Amino acid sequence: MRLLKKLIIIGLVVGTMMGIVACSSEGASNNTEENTTLNISAAASLQEAMVELEEKFKEIEPNVKLQVNLGASGALQQQIEEGAPCDVFISAGEKQMNALEEKGLLLEGTNKTLLTNELVLVESEGTEIKDLDKLTTYDINKIAIGEPESVPAGKYAKEVLDNTNLYDKVKGKLVLAKDVKEVLAWVQQGNADVGFVYLSDAFAAKGIKIALTTDEDTHSAINYPIAVLKESKNQNKAKAFEDFLLSDDGQAILENYGFKKAN
């Protein structure tokens, strides 16, 4: 009888200890999940939208933190190629994403078109431009565009000027910015008379107005691709974030900031 009691007590003690170990393991697992960080490299034009997207994604994945790195798509591409930590890349141009694809840096099947945009000419208060030909007149001294080699918006702007036979006439007035946000700031601050930016950048900007929207046939299609990086240490969570951005909820948020749903 005493032996039976001892065996029962030992069994209870062992069971309790196993329960404690299981709870500890579960707690450690939860803590690890809480510390999951996704590094997102995104085009500068997504700055405002990313704030709301991050908040909404937090409701879906409360244990995931987003570390967002904003900049010119070309600069972000170079950082990724040089080994900078990145789980998800969102580019404002296909050229940069295709370069990473060709180097085998993207997770297979994740390179998708996230959204589209429009290119507009913005002007400072007091400037009146009805058509692009006005850029050649004496009262327009500085035209801001992104650096065409590294800033997709700058590439599109140069295409517009080339295809309307204006580039040679206005190239002496061009001032090149490191990204599209700097173009917008220069016009807002009066450091440039006009500038080419995305519709999403001008959408709620103060101190400027949209002079005109460029014709789609004067520049390449403005598509924003998204992809998960092959070297991501959190591929499942990265794919979950990509899926969220492509979902109806993610697309609705992006549309609120002037972006358009990809066809």
Regions of interest found by a model, annotated:
Residues 1-27:
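Sec-dependent N-terminal signal peptides of Gram-positive bacterial secreted proteins and lipoproteins
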Residues 23-55, 74, 78-81, 93-94, ...:
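Exported/periplasmic ABC-transporter solute-binding proteins
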Residues 38, 64-66, 119:
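Conserved beta-strand core positions
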Residues 87-91:
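Periplasmic-binding protein-like
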